[in-house]
């Protein structure tokens, strides 16, 4: 309680005795700010007129350091307009002095209960669901699917854009399953060279190929009894897809260089940022393998479709990163919150992580402001419009039509240039995997060479 008249402070303390709460009384704004800095209270009763500063000055100082602490102003009749203005700046309520005991008790009790409920709501929202953060309706549907499917041995096929948390989802499925205490083994089919991925998956014996100095266990054997997660599955070579299908059907496999069959019990979870059925139709993914694995589909929504989850995730990451980097950041400014809500996040949660890491490392303070954000967020004046440009209204002649691969090549090269040669970043904006771009660049180089030979 911040009240400079001792008799009034003593009277109000007696009014609040039945609530069984601890009350600390100070008589100046400076003492109030220092006291709150030492120990954050559950509620502040603040007189509008103080001997050393105004109640509004105290309000601003408190909101700077402890933005979540509720404040109830106490004011005389002539200052009601100021009290209303204070509520616009974050005060929760105001009392007109002199106030009766019942009115004071009800106001204080309601303010404390409201603050406690708000804190519990925030805590509940920020509780991780098996590693996820977010309480949007789209994510609630994901959580329900995980809960329903986790106990089954049926294969789960996770789809979603890059950076949406497909591996987190796979780990959540494993943790919620009966196999949760057994191994979870992940293998990224796009990150391993074609000639090594079979060895990574099934293992190899000594001397199976150059460099195989010792026998090595593969991911399939390591996952025995647990879950085998095949990330970016649609990047797998067709020849290896055949062997994978046999492994799924029989539960047996051979190490590279061995004729001996090994048997394991694994639950398959796989993921891709592509449309798996489209990959089947275009001949890049085996149809029989698709039907074997696409038993329970689970789509992860992009961050832009998750509403205020972006703010929940941002605050969770901010707290972790600030502590890790030894910084004091505790909140986002209102402008940053709005910018985060507007932005389309083409790189999803992974991009949000990178943005916050950049800000925390390169800046100081307690609040993240717009000027701290890296491009393109600090340059946005409106939500990014990622819609494709409209087709040219004028008719084109047949001489102006280019092969589709050349048009695609131009679009990808422009994206790479815009991203300063950073192919993984360009892939994020183009909504494809980096390996897709590398593969296409190689194919186009071969086509250009063929064209030159024809000349």
Swiss-Prot record:
Q: Which GO terms describe its biological process?
A: phosphorelay signal transduction system; positive regulation of DNA-templated transcription
Which residues constitute the signal peptide according to the record? none
Q: Where does ATP bind?
A: 160-167, 223-232
GO MF term list: ATP binding; ATP hydrolysis activity; cis-regulatory region sequence-specific DNA binding; DNA-binding transcription activator activity
Q: Name one GO cellular component term.
A: protein-DNA complex
Q: Matching SMART domains, A to Z?
A: AAA, REC
Keyword DNA-binding found = yes
One Pfam family from the UniProt entry?
A: HTH_8
Q: Which residues form the Sigma-54 factor interaction domain?
A: 132-361
Query: Which InterPro entries does this chain map to?
Result: AAA+_ATPase, CheY-like_superfamily, Homeodomain-like_sf, HTH_Fis, P-loop_NTPase, QS_regulatory_LuxO, Sig_transdc_resp-reg_receiver, Sigma_54_int
| Keyword terms, alphabetized | ATP-binding, DNA-binding, Nucleotide-binding, Phosphoprotein, Repressor, Transcription, Transcription regulation, Two-component regulatory system
4-aspartylphosphate-modified residues are 47
Q: Which residues form the Response regulatory domain?
A: 1-112
Instruction: Mention any additional remark.
Output: In strain El Tor C6706, at low cell density, LuxO acts indirectly on virulence gene expression by repressing hapR This leads to the expression of virulence factors. In strain El Tor N16961, the hapR gene is inactive due to a natural frameshift mutation.
The free-text function statement in the UniProt record for this protein reads: Involved in the regulation of different processes depending on the cell density. Acts together with sigma-54 to repress, perhaps indirectly, some genes.
Q: What is this protein called?
A: Regulatory protein LuxO
Question: Where does this protein come from, organism-wise?
Answer: Vibrio cholerae serotype O1 (strain ATCC 39315 / El Tor Inaba N16961)
């Amino acid at each position: 309680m911040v009240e400079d008249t001792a008799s009034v402070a003593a009277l109000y303390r007696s009014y609040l005795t039945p609530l069984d709460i601890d009350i600390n009384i100070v008589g100046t704004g400076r003492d109030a700010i220092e006291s709150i800095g030492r120990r954050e209270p559950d509620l502040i009763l603040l007189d509008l007129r103080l001997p050393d500063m105004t109640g509004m000055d105290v309000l601003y100082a408190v909101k700077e350091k402890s933005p979540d602490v509720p404040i109830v102003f106490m004011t005389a009749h002539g200052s009601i307009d100021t009290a209303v203005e204070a509520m616009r700046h974050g005060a929760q309520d105001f009392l007109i002095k002199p106030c009766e005991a019942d009115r004071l008790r009800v106001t204080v009790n309601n303010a404390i209960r409201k603050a406690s409920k708000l804190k519990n709501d925030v805590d509940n929202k920020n509780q991780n669901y098996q590693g996820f953060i977010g309480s949007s309706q789209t994510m609630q549907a994901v959580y329900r699917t995980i809960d329903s499917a986790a106990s089954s041995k049926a294969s789960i096929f996770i789809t979603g854009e890059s950076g949406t948390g497909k591996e987190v989802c796979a780990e959540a499925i494993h943790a919620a399953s009966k196999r949760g205490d057994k191994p979870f083994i992940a293998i990224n089919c796009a990150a391993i060279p074609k000639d090594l991925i079979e060895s990574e998956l099934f293992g190899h014996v000594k001397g199976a190929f150059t460099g195989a100095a010792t026998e090595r266990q593969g991911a399939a054997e390591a996952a025995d009894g647990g879950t085998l997660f095949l990330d970016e599955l649609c990047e797998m070579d067709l020849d290896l897809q055949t062997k994978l299908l046999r492994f799924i059907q029989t539960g047996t496999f051979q190490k590279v260089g061995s004729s001996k069959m090994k048997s394991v019990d694994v639950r398959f979870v796989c993921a891709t940022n592509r449309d798996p059925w489209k990959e089947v139709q275009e001949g890049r993914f085996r149809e029989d393998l698709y039907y074997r694995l696409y038993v329970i589909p689970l789509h992860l929504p992009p961050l832009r479709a998750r509403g205020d989850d972006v703010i929940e995730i941002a605050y969770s990451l901010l707290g972790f990163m600030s502590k890790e980097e030894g910084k004091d950041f505790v909140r986002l400014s209102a402008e940053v919150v709005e910018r985060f809500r507007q932005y389309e996040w083409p790189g999803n949660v992974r991009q949000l992580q990178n943005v916050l890491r950049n800000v925390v490392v390169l800046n100081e303070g307690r609040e993240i402001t717009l000027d701290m954000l890296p491009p393109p967020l600090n340059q946005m004046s409106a939500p990014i419009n990622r819609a494709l440009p409209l087709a040219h209204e004028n008719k084109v002649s047949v001489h102006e039509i280019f092969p589709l691969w050349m048009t695609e090549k131009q679009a990808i090269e422009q994206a790479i240039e815009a991203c300063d040669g950073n192919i993984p970043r360009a892939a994020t904006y183009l909504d494809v995997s980096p390996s897709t771009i590398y593969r296409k660049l190689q194919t186009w180089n071969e086509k250009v060479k063929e064209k030159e030979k024809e000349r």
